[in-house]
């Protein structure tokens, strides 16, 4: 008798639609599905893929990072496109004139961008203004900035490891003796 083939790892795991039931997000997906199919632009395909992503894969972009990225050469008068949130940064005082398109912008940011003579667009307005993504700069927030990434990597306690251990407390008796000082076993 032959052995039946395992089919449990056959499928390619990727999102074909957003997990969220948000009707406004799903309307955007409908729109960008159409644009991705009918235009030959990779911009629309990337935006569609990012609309499907989970929240951890759509990290927020701070105002300071947005300004820094838009100050680069050749990016003046272009629209910054963020498939995610833009959050305010109170450390920044003067905001240059920006043209921004994002899923959500905090109220503080919104008022500051408009005050500096900038413009804020939604994705359906962007689809009318730039159906192929012309004169746009696609930006995204730092994915690895989440605290959880500090715990990943080489095991804590091994030589040259900078990985944060999962400990109950940060006291004197926790992760401070064996392997940390020569008098207690060894020192890495």
Swiss-Prot record:
GO BP of this protein: cytoplasmic translation
Function: Component of the large ribosomal subunit. The ribosome is a large ribonucleoprotein complex responsible for the synthesis of proteins in the cell.
InterPro entries reported for this sequence: Ribosomal_eL18 (IPR000039), Ribosomal_eL18/eL18-A/B/_CS (IPR021132), Ribosomal_uL15/eL18 (IPR021131), Ribosomal_uL15/eL18_sf (IPR036227)
Protein known as: Large ribosomal subunit protein eL18B
Keywords carried by this UniProt record: Cytoplasm, Endoplasmic reticulum, Ribonucleoprotein, Ribosomal protein
Subunit and interaction comment: Component of the large ribosomal subunit.
Main location: cytoplasm
Region (Disordered), start-end ranges: 153-188
SS bond partners: none
Family listed: Belongs to the eukaryotic ribosomal protein eL18 family.
Stored Gene3D superfamilies: 3.100.10.10
Native source organism of the sequence: Xenopus laevis
